[in-house]
Curated annotation (Swiss-Prot):
Keyword Ribosomal protein found: yes
Record's keyword terms, sorted: Ribonucleoprotein, Ribosomal protein
Name of the protein described by the UniProt record: Small ribosomal subunit protein uS2
InterPro entries named in the record: Ribosomal_uS2, Ribosomal_uS2_bac/mit/plastid, Ribosomal_uS2_CS, Ribosomal_uS2_flav_dom_sf
Organism of origin: Leuconostoc citreum (strain KM20)
Top-rank taxon, per record: Bacteria
Record flagged with keyword Ribonucleoprotein: yes
Pfam families associated with the record: Ribosomal_S2
Similarity-based family: Belongs to the universal ribosomal protein uS2 family.
Record GO biological process: translation
GO molecular function, one term: structural constituent of ribosome
Length: 258
């Protein structure tokens, strides 16, 4: 059984790549065809590679790995935060601060500052300070929470990065590569797949597509933590004899563009 069916991928628009003029030639093996100037991703390969990514995430989770979900563009921001939290993991969904991984010790000092400010807000310290100072401290707390709130409880460097759009998150991927932290990523037709360890060829600009893939990666982590007998409901889908072939999908796409 596959983790995600071809039909689910199609309905979420996972097959739509970028304009052909924006492609990265290294993605050629994951492209099925071109329709009206748009590359169409080979969903038969995506189905298999989602399975591989799911197994990788599940196995790492079983081994106790910590995961950092990264996706800062608006199409990914909500799904990244919600699915990481559902899996009990960590996330960055607004802006990647350079050095988050490679200068972790400095980042930890900013996280501690955030925690200190939160404690001050809760223990009544703010009530004893001048209002102007409290306003400034609250602004600082809000800014730190925006960028670091998703990793404030991360015990150390993550063991695995899950990334939506490694082209957009180039700095995060480079830092992970430098530290030999494996990267699992949704990768569109405009990006270089060679910087990613576990590839999921997919439309990384559609909210539904991002949500679908990200949720399955969260399912994998949950299953790994709980064990095979407690796999998330509907984590796997039965093979659908009526699922469209990739040729039929291409025709559907072409008809939809006419």
């Amino acid at each position: 059984m596959a983790v995600i069916s071809m039909k689910e991928l199609l309905e979420a628009g996972v097959h739509f790549g970028h304009q052909t003029r924006r492609w990265d030639p290294k993605m050629d093996e994951y492209i099925f065809t071109e329709r009206n100037g748009i590359h169409i991703i080979d969903l038969q390969k995506t189905v298999k590679l989602v399975d591989e990514a799911y197994n990788f995430m599940r196995n790492a989770s079983t081994d106790g790995a910590n995961f950092l979900f990264v996706g800062t563009k608006k199409q990914a921001s909500d799904a990244i935060a919600e699915e990481a939290a559902r899996a009990g993991q960590y996330f960055i969904n607004h802006r990647w601060l350079g050095g988050t991984l490679t200068n972790w010790n400095t980042i930890k000092t900013r996280i501690q500052r955030l925690k200190d400010l939160e404690a001050m807000a809760e223990d009544g310290t703010f009530e004893q300070l001048p209002k102007k100072e409290v306003v400034l401290l609250n602004k600082q707390r809000e800014k730190l929470n925006k960028f670091l709130g998703g990793i404030k409880d991360m015990p150390g460097l993550p063991d695995v990065l899950f990334v939506v759009d490694p082209k957009k998150e180039e700095i995060a991927v480079k830092e992970a590569n430098m530290l030999n932290i494996p990267v699992v990523a949704m990768i569109d037709t405009n990006a270089n797949p060679e910087v990613v360890d576990v590839k999921i060829p997919a439309n990384d600009d559609a909210i539904r597509a991002v949500r679908l893939i990200t949720a399955k990666m969260a399912d994998a982590i949950i299953e790994g933590r709980q064990g095979q007998d407690s796999a998330p409901e509907d984590a796997f889908v039965a093979g659908d004899e009526n699922t469209e072939s990739i040729e039929e999908i291409a025709n559907i796409v072409e008809e939809g563009n006419n």
